[in-house]
């Protein structure tokens, strides 16, 4: 079994040293969803949630979270991401919001934690803004869709 890179041989947590790795262009795409009542979606779409524009706020929260990932996850490297995008899709069933986030960087380590954090915080923001009208919401299926690295 492969040894985890963030643990020492004695099992202590450490930040991985990436200084010898080459700087590469890297991108990650993550996805997740929040299930909610169709009536809640109508309120979101008509901008009738008391706390304000839900999707605009969730988009900004996701982007901000991606930028702060290194402060939130103890062994995650603080990265100067060069691009982050958060988008939303409402499927025909109208019982969920699908959240997709992409992040890009030119660095010595990947940017997947930033994309995953963006999706998660966007979903939590939707939850927070809608919890007064919907007690059934469920955040689920947050996962990495794609991770790429290209030579500069």
Where are the predicted features?
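C-terminal binding/interaction regions
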Residues: 1-55, 60-152
């Amino acid at each position: 079994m492969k040894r985890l890179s963030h643990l020492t041989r004695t099992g202590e947590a450490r930040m991985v040293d990436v200084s010898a790795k080459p700087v590469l262009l890297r991108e990650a795409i993550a996805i997740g969803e929040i299930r909610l009542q169709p009536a809640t979606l109508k309120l979101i779409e008509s901008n009738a949630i008391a706390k304000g524009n839900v999707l605009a706020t969730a988009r900004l929260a996701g982007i901000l979270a991606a930028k702060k990932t290194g402060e939130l996850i103890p062994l995650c490297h603080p990265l100067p991401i060069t691009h982050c995008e958060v988008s939303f899709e409402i499927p025909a069933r109208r019982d969920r919001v699908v959240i997709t986030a992409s992040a890009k960087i030119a660095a010595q380590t990947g940017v997947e934690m930033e994309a995953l954090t963006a999706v998660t915080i966007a979903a939590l923001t939707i939850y927070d803004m809608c919890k007064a009208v919907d007690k059934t919401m469920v955040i689920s299926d947050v996962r990495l869709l794609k991770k790429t690295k290209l030579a500069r």
